[in-house]
Amino acid sequence: MGRLSVNLCGIELDNPVIPASGTFGFGYEFAELYDINCLGTFSFKGTTRDPRFGNPTPRIAECNMGMINAVGLQNPGVEKVISDELPKLAKCFNKKVMANVSGFSVEDYAYTCEKLDKEDQVGWLEVNVSCPNVHGGGMSFGTNPEAAAEVTRAVKAVTTKPVIIKLSPNVTDIVSIAKACEAAGADGISLINTLLGMRIDLRTKKPVIANKMGGFSGPAILPVAVRMVYQVSHAVSIPVIGMGGVSCAEDVIEMMLAGATAVEVGAANLVDPYTCRNIIADLPCVMDQYGIENLTDIIGGVK
């Protein structure tokens, strides 16, 4: 059997498969379906300084080869995440978890990360500067190299945990933003978040979601994600987590060949909650099929 383990910012993962934030709750919900300790880790639901009720409904809609969502970072706020959600997770998950953090100001990001820094259960801070469906924050920090670097510096000043900056594809030059984050001290980069999209109901002549626009995800965005992972991973010297349209073991291998150290799986979890477990089970067979003995050896191996 091939070797599946990878090292992500100094922490060893049994395998590179990571359910993406926003598609896996706080983890314990999925523990009712299978043993989530089979995962490399997972990125829990995007957490903000204060509670958020999210956007008006409808906020999720299916479309060809994917879905559009504008949930709007609904979450109980960092205090409740620490007091209520993490203790529930500790009962069913014995690995380090990735905390996904969003904010509406540099101070928001720093405050939330400083709170989570005190939690032993948290192994990495995934700082989301790329949410396309909230107003007054989120993606605005991820579309400008200087703003992304400012958030990175602020977070690095309050934590000793690895900081991974999650980038938006809705930019003209993602490489410059990744390099700015690296220069500001980021320990890793994750990409891509969803593509900004919109669909209109022909009968009502209204957008299919109340927010009008939202994040498009699903198999259709895989080629865009692979391209951006390739570009960024060849421009920085820190680990890259690839995501976007991943739904099977072959997609994981493709992302790693493009340069990803680990791979997040998002929308596919909403189609089939067993997706990540199945990918992990399928990886040894796919590795054998393509003559891969050690996943670490193929990172960035595209010719």
Locate predicted features:
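Predominant activation on well-ordered alpha-helical scaffold segments within soluble catalytic domains
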Residues: 31, 82, 86, 149-153, ...
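A short, charged, Gly/Pro-tolerant segment at domain boundaries
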Residues: 296-303
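N-terminal capping/small domains of soluble enzymes
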Residues: 1-97, 102-104
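Short acidic/polar active-site loop segments enriched in Thr and Asp
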Residues: 39-40, 45, 95, 122-125, ...
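Alpha/beta enzyme core
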Residues: 91, 106-241, 250-265
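Short gly/pro/ser/thr-enriched loop/turn and capping motifs at secondary-structure boundaries
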Residues: 48-53, 132-134, 196-199, 270-272
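C-terminal helical cap(s) of enzyme catalytic domains, especially alpha/beta-barrels
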Residues: 55-64, 200-214, 256, 268-293
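Short donor-sugar binding/catalytic loops of nucleotide-sugar-dependent glycosyltransferases
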Residues: 246
